[in-house]
Amino acid sequence: MTVYYKGFPQSDRNEAIKMVNVDELEDRVRKVMPEAAYYYIASGSENEWTWRNNTAAFNHFQIVPRSLTNMDNPSTETQFMGMDLKTPIMICPIACHGIAHKDAEVATAQGAKAAGALFSSSTYANRSVEDIATATGDSPKFFQLYLSKDWDFNKMVFDAVKSAGYKGIMLTVDALVSGYREANLRTNFTFPVPLDFFTRYVGAEGEGMSVAQMYANSAQKIGPADVAKIKEMSGLPVFVKGVMNAEDAYMAIGAGADGIVVSNHGGREIDTAPATIDMLPEIAAAVNGRVPIILDSGVRRGSHVFKALALGADLVGIGRPFLYGLALGGAKGVESVINQINNEFKILMQLTGCKTVEDVKHADIRQINYTADNLPSNTDPSVRRAYPVTKENQMEGTQDAATGASKH
């Protein structure tokens, strides 16, 4: 069930996961994942207010039930940018899936394919875009770009992504430098597994680098001209990822963006930034249907997916939960996570008389002044729990927190 890369424990599971909801996976994954690796995934920046509020803010919106709709068997299938999907839930790009599973992004993409969901791969992925494409065929795939200062590197990435059959690029614009992530500092987190594009271009594997060091390789300034240049060089649709206000949405569309991703990087960059769901109505009104909108950050329930679609999103991304599924069950675990949230979403479609995803976009949502900010912060010493020590979450041979193991 566990293999080791230079002493770093990696799951090799491939099994469906039984769960009541995806939240319960966060405790379960601590038993199979090293402490630093877990906190790299789970934590946010500074006091983690935004990380917590991203989920809590969905309680600002109420779903108004509908009855006497004479409808059954709703369909969660949808189309997006010419791609046929079984669900409006997508896999968000996250770096280094190898901290969760030995097959890394290949297993994640296989799980997304099985669930009929759009998969997106990170510039800082462990596995190559070619390996992922070979394992998943023509299943829908996007690529997330951390723009490099080196345009030769960028061109190499664009050519590889297009040749591998990816359907679009998500340009990340909200992470020009790393947010101040205290949990990563406390555990001395560094990437324990090589990152493909670093290996093939600069000969530096990325292994052993901190998050801040990794971001230092990326462009520290991005403007509208970069969006146009990426479109021209790549020949692919470009979504601007990290839009949190109407003005930036206008600028992105004006620069030629083919889509908008409403995201605050999962609460990992600016702490006390607004929750994405709170900003979505304003941004959707500004976009006014001119380009598709994706929302991510804080999504944990089918009701969150429903609310995001009703408030203006076309797809809804999940991040941390699928990595927990990857660690606990490999490709089948990722599929289980997507199916769990999608099944919750389908129940709400039935209870609101929504036969299709398009119907959900016209559902009745009411905003209220309410919050339920009851999630503990990973950085608050008063609520930090002792990290469990198990055979599966320890380094092989040595105990070195810098590469992800606990010291107790």
UniProtKB/Swiss-Prot annotation:
Binding note for cofactor: Binds 1 FMN per subunit.
Key word Disulfide bond present: no
InterPro entries (UniProt xref): Aldolase_TIM, Alpha-hydoxy_acid_DH_FMN, FMN-dep_DH, FMN_HAD
Keyword vocabulary terms for this entry: Flavoprotein, FMN, Oxidoreductase
SUPFAM superfamilies (alphabetical): FMN-linked oxidoreductases
Amino-acid positions noted as binding pyruvate in the UniProt annotation, renumbered to this chain: 40, 146, 181, 265, 268
Annotated Pfam families: FMN_dh
Coiled-coil blocks: none
Active site: 265 (proton acceptor)
Tagged with keyword Electron transport: no
Residues annotated as transmembrane: none
Cofactor: FMN
Enzyme class: oxidoreductase
FMN hydroxy acid dehydrogenase domain boundaries: 14-370
Gene Ontology molecular function: FMN binding; oxidoreductase activity
Positions contributing to FMN binding: 93-95, 122, 144, 172, 241, 263, 296-300, 320
Catalytically driven reaction(s): a (2S)-2-hydroxycarboxylate + O2 = a 2-oxocarboxylate + H2O2; (S)-lactate + O2 = pyruvate + H2O2; 2-hydroxyoctanoate + O2 = 2-oxooctanoate + H2O2; glycolate + O2 = glyoxylate + H2O2
Enzyme Commission designation: 1.1.3.-, 1.1.3.15
Complex and partners: Homotetramer.
Protein purpose: Oxidase that catalyzes the oxidation of a broad range of 2-hydroxyacids in vitro, such as (S)-lactate, 2-hydroxyoctanoate, and to a lesser extent glycolate, mandelate and 2-hydroxyoctadecanoate, to the corresponding 2-oxoacids, with a reduction of O2 to H2O2. May be involved in the utilization of L-lactate as an energy source for growth.
Family to which the UniProt record says this protein belongs: Belongs to the FMN-dependent alpha-hydroxy acid dehydrogenase family.
Protein's UniProt name: L-lactate oxidase
The organism of origin for this protein: Lactobacillus jensenii
